[in-house]
């Protein structure tokens, strides 16, 4: 117990004092400055090594003392890391410059388009006879010439379409007339055929009148009469007209 109390009394003042804050400024004493440089340099190199191992980072550390002596550390290569740094800085600067250039270009193009839209709107109003107060005599004459030229083109196009429509209607009329003549001819031909058929039916020798005028043939009883053809003689003998033989 006495040993622990004595140890506590010895350690407690150190805990109370702790490590004081060091003012960050140039050390005037050359010896102290050199000693501090060596300590801090070794600690910095150690931290760089730990960072590269623990975090798998590419680290390059370059330190020059006040006497010009070089101290360096790199887990890969100082030169390769510096080249990579230069390339990254160049890419970022180029990206920024390209973005700025694009923004300026689009702004200029937008301004040009707005100006063109404004001019076209003014010209449209002038063509409609509006916003003529600020125009000079020469501008009004030019506007009049443009309007007359436009009207001439419009009339020419209108007449072209009108003539094409008239030509189409004339052609359509001819086609309808031809179709009408063809139908009339077919109707007349049909009427003539019907009239001829009616006349043939009314003639005495027509088949219909023949059936009406000629009585039907007489019916014979086959039990009492024989056909003449069955009793006809041969062609080598003279033919004799005989009445049909009646069987009793």
UniProtKB/Swiss-Prot annotation:
Residues 19-73 form the MADS-box domain. PROSITE patterns: K_BOX (PS51297), MADS_BOX_1 (PS00350), MADS_BOX_2 (PS50066). Keywords: Activator, DNA-binding, Nucleus, Transcription, Transcription regulation. GO terms for cellular component: nucleus. Residues 103-193 form the K-box domain. Gene3D superfamilies: Transcription factor, MADS-box. Disulfide bonds: none annotated. The keyword Nucleus applies. This is Floral homeotic protein AGAMOUS.
